[in-house]
Swiss-Prot record:
Bias kind Basic and acidic residues: ranges: 21-31, 874-899
Compositional bias segments (type: Polar residues): 67-83, 102-111
Region listing for Disordered, in residue ranges: 1-33, 45-127, 171-206, 646-665, 702-734, 865-899
SUPFAM superfamilies reported for this sequence: beta-beta-alpha zinc fingers
The protein, known as: Protein suppressor of hairy wing
Acidic residues: bias regions: 183-198
Length: 899
């Protein structure tokens, strides 16, 4: 080495990240050789940048060329020296840094270099893109050293290839080829890269061979991050999930949720996010807005990455011809358009960026979505004045006023639970609940879901998005269903009502939880009754024990015994006195008679009976029983039976008794007889025989035979003498009559059908045209309005005109013209009203055109004619199929007969 070379600086240029692969030498012996080679390379680069010539004592017989690609020093000349003058001493640069320092916005020189040296190669089954391929200009020169410098603000990448240049003793002896470049971002692979025989990006180390290989940078097709090794790229692809113009580093993916970067598009409701193709429901809120596009970002890092990828060049130079994307280079634009083609969706919306498979779907999207609507293009509902930006949403809203519901189709039936669904997609989602399949997993936690909609809702809890806000209290929610449930608190709506107690709830889950309280899980082992709580069951079992003891009760006192032996032992004792015996008998009779005289309901005690009479029948128990105790008071009951006329003549005459309006307790057919129960109010004494039914009070008259025979269960027929009874006040009698009359009316009303109330058009005289129009209206109503709504308006018992007016008025149209009703209008005045039926039910441009050009009669016949024609065609097809089947059977029979 010459003195001039010895005087060169001993450190490489500033902000350089250099990595040397020098064969299979041990690492502890490479340090001196590596530093000396770095010093020589840095010296050559500094000499070339100053335009000075290299000393001839560096082996003057060989030609050394250095090429510098640096936009900051474009005026510097490329030098080629063979010897000569001394080299001035440059300023000593800063020591090399092991780690690369990433700038906020790379300089344009890197892009220029990539454009100059772009010759993609090595495309053998590569699943990524090759953006840079730096190759020596003179591959055939045996004694050529090429140095390519790609410089930005913080990094200088060197590629040096010459195994004959005398740069150091170790290098000359081993004849190694060195690649000096920026360190890969994957620091974990540094040691492996030094030991492997393949240089970064595919450049092989060749000892004693002057042929130079190319260096290739591998780029991720989703986030455009570059790698020099395929292994590093494949490892990156396991974590890179986004293709919207930015990427998430591996370290960021594994950190907590606050540091995960997500792009967002701030758009109107119902728009589609450009960055992730999600709807407005899942768009990511951000606070850092891009001044050149409608995107916003959560972190400064994601914003700077977006600026570098999208807006580092003039966005207007490379706009996408399919969507509204604008890219920074022609290469990225080409890759972006290829993604449209690979996805099979070459048609995209220019406003929201959503792409479609065919142009028809794009036109429908532009017609019915808010991408083509503005504040002036609004449609309001005539019923509730609600405003809509899309026609399909308005049509769906009007169906709610009409009562139209989506019909579940039997062809979409689950083979497991036999439930029907609206479409095949909903059926497939439902089947996953039986199979347990959950193909949609969250990338932020371990949860999995059976539907994509459920996954989108779940992601909002990670991102903290709450796009649904209450207009009353400004509280925000992540899911729309939760907002709807919250709004019912403000409106007081409780649609879920309990059938047992009548209590209402907002949610169906609340009703299901409440319904469990009405379940009776505690069943009695002695009878069929069930109870809600265990205490109620214990109380009921005590009643069974009390009744069992009452079967062995003493007739002289109130004591009861479990067995007959104990009762006999008690009676043999002889401890009862006559006074005690009388009181005991009276108490026993009172206990025996504790059933209600009005509804025949039994009770355990007289106190519960009195409470029942006060609460249920709203009467005073003393007025019902008088001055006598309940055991002494006998309810005057009689039974009547409806029998045949020939049986009535044969019945024994029973003296009539003065009674008032009664209550029909029950009337039913039992076997071959009719049993009727009736409660009659006794208004006075009479010389008649009464039927006292203590327990059941059933009077059964068989209908077969010539004479009706009477058989009464537990009935005592006594001749009751006339005697004074306690008087009842007129007020009490009036209340009794009112209560019993109401009970009788309610019982009769249950067996009557509700009369038709739509008789307003019954007296109208119809002409032949009106009759034809009336028939067509009936067919039209059946075809256009769903059966539930028709049944609500009294169809088919009500007239066609009445149902037609109710349907139209329910949609917000006032049909009354002064005091005139529809039936009072003439034939010509009815036409506009009939035309309204099409307006509120059918949203079809062709039908509207027919209404504007033809009479309403012709339009109705046209619509009905199509339906009849379709039915005729189906009938003809069915007949043809039957004829074909008949011919086939005939041919088969002929073949069988021949055989």
């Amino acid at each position: 080495m010459s003195a001039q070379e010895d005087a060169l600086p001993a450190t490489p240029p500033a902000s350089s990240s250099i990595k040397i692969s020098d064969g299979d030498k041990p690492k502890e012996k490479r340090t001196g050789t590596r530093m000396k080679l770095l010093n020589d390379v840095a010296a050559k680069a500094a000499v070339a940048s100053k335009g000075a010539s290299v000393s001839p004592r560096l082996k003057p017989e060989k030609r050394t060329s250095i090429k510098i690609l640096n936009n900051n020093n474009n005026d510097e000349a490329q030098t080629s020296t063979k010897g000569g003058d001394s080299v001035p001493r440059p300023k000593p640069p800063a020591p090399a840094s092991r780690y690369r320092t990433r700038s906020s916005a790379p300089a344009s020189s890197a892009v220029e270099t990539a454009k100059i040296k772009t010759s993609p190669s090595k495309k053998k089954k590569m699943d990524h893109y090759v953006l840079q391929a730096i190759k020596s200009e003179n591959n055939k020169a045996e004694n050529t050293t090429s140095v390519v410098v790609v410089e930005d603000e913080d990094t200088i990448d060197f590629i040096l290839a010459d195994d004959e240049v005398e740069l150091g003793a170790g290098a000359k002896e081993n004849g190694e080829e060195f690649v000096v470049s920026g360190v890969d971002e994957d620091d974990d692979d540094d040691d492996d890269d030094e030991d492997e025989g393949v240089v970064e990006g595919g450049a092989k180390r060749r000892s004693g061979n002057n042929e130079l290989k190319e260096m290739v940078e591998h780029v991720c097709g989703k986030c455009y991050k570059t790698f020099r090794r395929v292994k590093s790229l494949k490892k990156h692809l396991e974590f890179c999930r986004y293709d919207s113009g930015y990427h998430l580093r591996k370290a960021d993916m594994l950190k907590n949720l606050e540091k995960i970067e997500k792009d967002a598009v701030v758009m109107e409701k119902k728009d589609i996010s450009f960055c992730c193709s999600e709807s407005y429901d899942t768009f990511h809120l951000g606070h850092i807005n891009c001044p050149d596009c409608p995107k916003s970002f959560k972190t400064q890092t994601s914003y700077e990455r977006h600026i570098f990828i999208t807006h580092s060049w003039s966005c207007n130079d490379y706009p996408c011809s399919i969507c509204n994307a604008k890219l920074r280079s022609g290469a990225l634009l080409k890759l972006h358009e290829q993604q449209h083609q690979l996805r099979g969706k070459p048609f995209a919306c220019k406003i929201c960026g959503k792409d479609f498979m065919c142009s028809y779907h794009l036109k429908c999207h532009q017609k019915y979505s808010s991408c083509s609507a503005n504040e002036n293009d609004t449609m309001s509902c005539k019923v509730c004045d609600r405003v809509f930006y899309r026609l399909d949403n308005l049509c769906a809203h009007l169906k709610q006023h009409l009562g139209t519901q989506v019909v579940k189709k039997p062809e979409y039936m689950c083979h497991v639970c036999k439930n029907c669904f609206y479409s095949l997609s909903t059926l497939n989602i439902h089947i996953r609940t039986h199979t347990g399949e959950k193909p949609f997993d969250c990338d932020l936690c371990d949860k999995k879901f059976s539907a994509l909609v459920a996954l989108k809702k779940h992601r909002r809890y990670h991102t903290g998005e709450k796009p649904y806000t209450c207009t009353v209290c400004s509280q925000s929610f992540a899911v729309k269903e939760v907002l709807n449930r919250h709004m019912k608190r403000h409106t007081g709506e409780r649609p879920h009502k309990c059938n047992e107690c009548g209590k209402s709830f907002i949610q169906a889950t609340q009703l299901r939880t409440h319904s469990k309280t009405h379940l009776r899980p505690y069943a009695c082992s002695l009878c069929i009754q069930k109870f809600k709580t265990e205490k109620q069951l214990e109380r009921h079992v005590k009643d069974h024990t009390r009744q069992k003891r009452a079967s062995f009760a003493c007739t002289e006192c109130t004591r009861s015994f479990r067995t007959s032996a104990l009762l006999k032992e008690h009676l043999d004792a002889g401890d009862h006195s006559p006074v005690k015996s009388t009181r005991a008998k009276r108490s026993a009779k009172m206990i025996e008679r504790t059933d209600c005289a009005i509804c025949d309901k039994n009770f355990d005690t007289t106190e519960t009976l009195r409470n029942h009479i006060r609460s249920v029948h709203e009467c005073d128990p003393d007025d019902i029983f008088g001055t006598e105790p309940p055991a002494k008071r006998k309810a005057k009951k009689t039974v009547v039976a409806a029998v045949a006329e020939e049986q009535k003549e044969q019945e024994d005459d029973v003296p009539a008794r003065n009674t008032s309006a009664g209550s029909l307790i029950s009337s039913k057919t039992d076997g071959n007889g009719v049993v009727v129960r009736e409660f009659l109010v006794d208004e006075g004494d009479g010389n008649a025989q009464t039927i006292d039914l203590r327990k059941r009070g059933l009077h059964h008259l068989p209908l077969e035979g010539d004479k009706a025979t009477e058989s009464t269960a537990e009935t005592d027929i006594k001749a009751e003498s006339s005697k004074e009874k306690p008087s009842v006040s007129p007020v009490v009698k009036k209340e009794q009559r009112k209560s019993l009359a109401a009970s009788l009316a309610a019982a009769i009303a249950d067996n009557l059908e509700e009369p038709s109330s739509d008789d307003e058009f019954s007296g109208e005289v119809l002409t032949e045209e009106d009759l034809k129009l009336k028939e067509n209206i009936a067919k039209l109503i059946d075809m256009l309005v769903d059966p539930q709504t028709l049944k609500k308006y009294g169809w088919p018992n009500s007239s066609e005109e009445s149902v037609l007016c109710k349907v139209i008025e329910n949609c917000g149209h006032d049909l009354a013209k002064g005091s005139e009703a529809y039936a009072e209008l003439d034939y010509g005045s009815r036409m506009p009203i009939l035309q309204l039926l099409f307006t509120v039910v059918i949203h079809n441009d062709s039908i509207k055109a027919l209404l504007n050009n033809f009479p309403i009669d012709d339009v109705i016949e046209y619509v009905l004619g199509d339906e009849d024609q379709d039915q005729d065609q189906e009938t003809d097809k069915g007949k043809d199929r039957e004829a074909d089947n008949t011919d086939t059977d005939t041919r088969e029979d002929a073949v069988e007969s021949e055989a």
